A protein has these predicted regions:
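A conserved FAD-binding loop/helix module that cradles the flavin
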Residues: 54-67, 71, 82-92, 151, ...
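Short helix/loop capping segments that flank catalytic or ligand/cofactor-binding pockets
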Residues: 21-22, 61
Length: 189
């Protein structure tokens, strides 16, 4: 209603996204499972022994892991991909890895989170199907990307003369996409 009261000619919505929590059994109700966003925004406390699930494959995971390593946490990053930070560019990955390994990170590739059950984290190798149970985790951090926060766009659609939805509120992707969309919209109007 506040937006409508302004009687805008054009509304550009860029309300972002929220962390995506996949339907992994037990993850959504696990009291010690938090998102990488929670780590970076410091909205939740983090234990000493951290298991980090990097499903997204971007810098969100490596940045949050490095942030925790700088606090003296023991961090292990597990990913279903062939490498942690799979989508990090070839010129950026070597210095990221150098910093992480220099701070004591452990990494395991081709493992995915299968379930969280009564304090036990269950991982599965994506090739062999072998499952392992982990009971040595104080905090489980996950990074599965985002879910569009587009409620404002949907509420205003059809109620203003022109409306554009950009960035993660349109679809969670990289910062480059958000900048490109915002540039396109700015040139359009």
């Amino acid at each position: 209603e506040a937006v409508l009261a302004e009687q805008p000619d054009v509304v550009v919505v860029a309300t972002g996204a929220t962390p995506f929590v996949p339907p992994v059994p037990g993850l959504g109700t696990c009291p010690y499972a938090i998102s990488a966003w929670d780590v970076l925004l410091e909205t939740r406390s983090v234990g000493q022994r951290v298991l980090f699930i990097d499903d997204q494959g971007g810098q969100e995971s490596t940045s949050a892991a490095e942030f925790l390593l700088d606090q003296g946490k023991q961090v292990e990053i597990v990913t279903p991909h062939y490498s942690v930070g799979e989508d990090i560019g070839p010129t950026s990955k070597p210095p990221v890895y150098a910093r992480l390994f220099g701070k004591g990170v452990k990494m395991q590739s081709t493992w995915e989170l299968r379930a969280v059950n009564n304090g036990t984290v269950i991982l599965r190798n994506v090739h062999a199907g072998v499952e392992v149970e982990r009971n040595d985790v104080d905090t489980l951090v996950f990074s599965y990307g985002g879910k569009s926060h587009d409620q404002l766009f949907r509420a205003l659609e059809g109620r203003v003369p022109a409306i554009e939805n950009v960035g993660d509120s349109y679809a969670p992707r990289s910062l480059h996409h958000a900048i490109m969309e915002a540039h396109r919209v700015a040139r359009k109007f």
